């Protein structure tokens, strides 16, 4: 038996925090109260808070969970949902990151691959992650696996292959599918392609979670697209990090909430999550037009080295921008690290 002594308990119910002791036997709490004398191993929690484990429903710790990293558990997070925003570590193949720009966030070895969910979960078990992990299957990763970085609709055979692989991943424990519809190749999928995949997920009891196609000028249309998938398939819909990007679009939040309430009245099972702060985090490539990313990072660099292409990319980027470049701050780069902490306007002035 163990006792957590003199801690401040915050139980998540909204009740006022209280100071108390907690008795533990095995993996269970057996009593809560004041126990001045008890035969148990004592853990001194003076000046510490005791809380239920936090569930981080929108995490990108897919790779870190395989590295026995302790940052999350030290912040009270005991369970995480990974595979968000259209990219997961499975199904993958060597050099997938060259086809999927968003995949570079994981900093994986180019030779690494996880053919399916089972391969990833087996790796998790052997590496003994500190947190419990539930993983979505990334629709962008899935699409790159069967079609590469090409634009356009999946052909009939590619669709069959994608559905088979998705069904297998769900049977192996994936909890649903995620999209990252303002990142390629996820963005190349149209509504009908997404519905085809969502139907497979719904049959297996999973959910559809979406990094929407747009959070700026086409925010309302992007939300409506996700809700339509819920209407037509019956699948539960999770709207990821719901936000209106750019001051010109802030007023749209009220309109979006009206759309969501209307969908709920129609029977759509819809929920949302949001940042607890005023900044978002993404790769800088999300600022670029989708066509410039077709073919992956190698093709993007080739286009940027072409003066005419670079001019067109700059013009299209400006046309779709909702914030000033002073609002975009570099938080991490592998080279020229002196740029970390500077905004894009400052970097442009330096260059």
What do the predicted segments below correspond to?
Residues 121-124, 129-132, 136-156, 162-183, ...:
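Active-site neighborhoods of metal-dependent hydrolases
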């Amino acid at each position: 038996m163990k006792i957590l002594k003199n801690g401040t308990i915050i139980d998540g119910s909204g009740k006022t925090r209280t100071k108390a002791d907690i008795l533990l036997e095995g993996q269970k709490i057996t009593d809560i109260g004041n126990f001045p004398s008890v035969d148990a191993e004592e853990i001194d929690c003076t000046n510490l808070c005791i809380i239920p484990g936090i569930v981080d429903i929108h995490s990108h710790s897919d790779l870190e969970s395989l590295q026995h990293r302790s940052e999350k558990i030290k912040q009270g997070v005991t369970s995480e949902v990974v595979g968000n925003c259209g990219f997961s570590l499975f199904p993958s193949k060597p050099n997938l990151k060259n086809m999927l720009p968003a995949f570079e966030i994981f900093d994986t070895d180019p030779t690494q691959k996880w053919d399916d969910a089972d391969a990833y979960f087996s790796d998790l078990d052997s590496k003994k992650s500190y947190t419990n992990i539930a993983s979505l299957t990334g629709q962008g990763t899935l699409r790159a696996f069967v079609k590469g970085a090409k634009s356009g609709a999946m052909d009939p055979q590619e669709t069959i292959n994608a559905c088979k692989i998705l069904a297998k991943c769900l049977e192996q424990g994936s909890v649903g599918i995620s999209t990252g519809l303002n990142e390629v190749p996820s963005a190349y999928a149209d509504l009908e392609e997404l519905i085809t995949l969502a139907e497979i997920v719904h049959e297996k009891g999973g959910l559809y979670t979406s990094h929407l196609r747009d959070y700026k000028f086409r925010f309302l249309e992007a939300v409506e697209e996700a809700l339509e998938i819920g209407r037509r398939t019956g699948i539960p819909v999770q709207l990821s990090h719901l936000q209106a990007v750019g001051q010109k679009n802030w007023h749209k939040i009220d309109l979006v909430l009206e759309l969501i309430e209307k969908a709920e009245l129609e029977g759509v099972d819809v929920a949302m999550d949001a940042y607890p702060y005023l900044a978002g985090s993404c790769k800088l490539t999300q600022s670029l037009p989708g066509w410039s990313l077709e073919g992956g990072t190698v093709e993007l660099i080739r286009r940027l080295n072409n003066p005419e292409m670079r001019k067109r990319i700059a013009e299209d980027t400006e046309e779709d921008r909702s914030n000033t470049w002073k609002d975009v701050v570099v938080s991490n780069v592998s080279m020229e690290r002196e740029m970390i902490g500077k905004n894009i306007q400052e970097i442009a002035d330096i260059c």
